Regions:
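Catalytic core of pol beta-like nucleotidyltransferases
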Residues: 2-107, 114-258
């Protein structure tokens, strides 16, 4: 005989339904309440992180469509394979390391794009580069090997991103043709972005390339899972070497030097 749903499950589903139906936007408090009540974050990731009109275009949904079309045109993909994520999407950061931080002029606009061929090419280029980074391969397990800390981070981040089927072009060497093409494509949309009069004028637009939408969903579901763990622990996570992308670290360092 099937068991009746528990009161906890009823409460969890009612909380999710109330926010989905009655909320045009999501506050950091709403997101925290959802994460505390739930263990499956697939719907939350899809509805609030990957779909819908982002905070920066909340009063101008048609202008968001124009922006997506322009990005898609640069990368020769469909507009449906482009979306704004992160703090520019929600109005606050969903990152376990910056949770609740409001989106502001110093914030970057993060864009997800899904050109599968570019993911394959970029990953191949990156691992070919990593093959040449660091000391020569040693087959002696008895010998210790010294590796530059930044090179080790690059290896770890490349493997992490490959597991989640995404590619960060900033990990390629600066003289790499594919890196320069991607950066040129995404930076060329900055003037248009500002011309579309977003809620907040921003300094930089970045992109992360995913192999397919399922990979993007899995990546942001994991972000929510890590955020829930951190909230349960009672605070914001401390950034570690394998948790923060090198380009984010460089941006933070540049800001502190300024």
């Amino acid at each position: 005989m099937a068991q009746a749903p528990s009161h906890a499950n009823d409460t969890e589903q009612k909380k999710l339904l109330d926010i989905l139906v009655n909320s045009a936007s999501l506050s950091s408090g709403d997101l925290k309440a959802l994460l505390v009540a739930m263990d499956n974050f697939d719907v939350v990731a899809k509805v609030f992180l990957l779909e819908g009109v982002p905070f920066v275009f909340s009063s101008k949904p048609m202008k968001y469509l124009i922006f997506r079309e322009q990005v898609a045109d640069r990368f020769e993909i469909g507009y449906q394979d482009v979306c704004i994520v992160g703090s520019a999407k929600l109005g606050f950061s969903p990152s376990p390391y910056k949770f609740g931080k409001p989106f502001e002029e110093t914030s970057d606009v993060d864009v997800v794009i899904i050109p599968s061929e570019m993911f394959d090419n970029g990953t191949h280029e990156l691992f070919r580069h990593l093959h040449k980074v660091g000391p020569a391969l040693s087959y002696s397990n008895a010998e210790s090997v010294s590796v530059d800390a930044r090179d080790w981070r690059l290896h770890k981040e490349a493997v992490r991103n490959f597991v989640y089927e995404n590619f960060n072009p900033s990990h390629l060497p600066e003289n790499n043709a594919l890196r320069n093409k991607i950066f040129s494509n995404i930076s060329s949309t900055s003037a248009l972005f500002l011309a579309l009069e977003p809620q907040v004028f921003v300094s930089k637009i970045r992109c992360r390339i995913f192999r397919h939408w399922r990979a993007a969903e899995a990546y942001y579901v994991n972000t929510l899972r890590q955020l829930k763990k951190q909230l349960a622990a009672g605070g914001i996570a401390q950034e570690t070497a394998v948790d923060v992308d090198l380009d984010e670290e460089d941006a933070a360092a540049a800001g502190s030097r300024g």
